From Swiss-Prot:
GTP binds at N127, V128, G129, K130, S131, S132, G171. It comes from Mycoplasma pneumoniae (strain ATCC 29342 / M129 / Subtype 1) (Mycoplasmoides pneumoniae). Required for a late step of 50S ribosomal subunit assembly. Has GTPase activity. Binds to the 23S rRNA. This is Probable ribosome biogenesis GTPase A. The keyword Nucleotide-binding applies. It comes from the Bacteria. Belongs to the TRAFAC class YlqF/YawG GTPase family. MTG1 subfamily. GO terms for cellular component: cytoplasm. GO terms for molecular function: GTP binding; GTPase activity. Residues 21-175 form the CP-type G domain. The keyword Zinc-finger does not apply.
Length: 271
């Protein structure tokens, strides 16, 4: 099996992310709580402690989406789900929010306030499913959604029930990544744009990771990444105009299919 190293450093922190950092910091005192959306394949890695620190004393629902692609572990602090659940997921989210805010509602009721409207921010890294979740809760395609990182650019408020208003926020990435393994895993969960990191580095890391933890999920055998890609290209009949094997396309397809869950359920949080 290949051992994988790379000297590449990821630095992806667009201007709108800094703006969102500043917005959330200012809004924190006026918000009643947050829904933190993470990727079920890497629920810890796709949290952003720089953002959640603003809401330390607020009720927080952590929702791990794409659970159908993940090898999940029991964790009572996380609600696991998939957007394919539709109304079932909506009911689970609303029920969980009602439970989280029951104590607050009791306090307000004791003060004679019978109508409660709570303002929540939906936070998370790029492309973890925040806008899609709000669309589901609103029962309509209200917010701009695309399967790539960095689509939502501004904040907007939406009523999802008589009690709760939600604001989607642009996905906010770490200001810095010191461990390249973390960066590659975030590419493989589609949090980081693939263009930010050399594709061959991502593919090589993915091959090494699957070889170590999930060898049964690799679509083809290979003693190293080079042999694996050759077998991949031959099996898929990936040829260039010169009739040579298109190794670059093989790498691209391998990474894309892994991101989209074609090979089976997994976790990207194994050592």
């Amino acid at each position: 099996m290949d051992t994988f190293t790379s000297a590449v450093k990821i630095n992806w922190f667009p201007g709108h992310m800094k703006k969102t950092h500043d917005q959330l910091k200012k809004l924190a005192s006026s918000l009643d709580g947050v829904i933190e959306v993470v990727d079920a394949r890497a629920p810890t890695l796709t949290q952003n402690p720089e953002i959640t620190a603003y809401f330390t004393n607020k009720p927080k629902l952590t929702l791990a989406l794409k659970a159908d692609l993940a090898q999940t572990v029991a964790n009572s602090n996380i609600l696991w789900g998939t957007l394919k659940q539709g109304l079932q997921l909506k009911r689970l989210v609303i029920k969980k929010l009602q439970t989280l805010f029951q104590a607050k509602k009791n306090q307000l009721k004791a003060k004679g306030l019978l109508v409660h409207q709570f303002r929540l921010a939906v936070i998370g890294m790029p492309n973890v499913g925040k806008s899609s979740l709000i669309n589901l809760l609103l029962n309509k395609n209200h917010l701009q959604v695309a399967n790539r990182a960095g689509v939502t650019k501004s904040m907007s408020w939406n009523q999802i029930s008589s009690e709760f208003y939600l604001s989607d926020t642009p996905g906010v990435f770490f200001k810095r990544i010191d461990e390249m393994a973390v960066g590659y895993k975030l590419v493989l969960t589609n949090v980081i744009k693939r263009e930010v990191v050399p594709l061959e580095d991502v593919g090589a890391f993915a091959f090494c990771y699957l070889s170590k933890h999930y060898p049964q999920l690799l679509p083809y055998e290979g003693t190293d990444f080079t042999e694996f890609l050759h077998k991949f290209a031959i099996s898929r009949k990936l040829l260039q105009k010169s009739n040579q094997l298109n190794i670059n396309l093989a790498c691209e397809l391998f990474v894309s299919e892994l991101i989209n869950g074609k090979y089976g359920k997994l976790s990207f949080e194994l050592d």
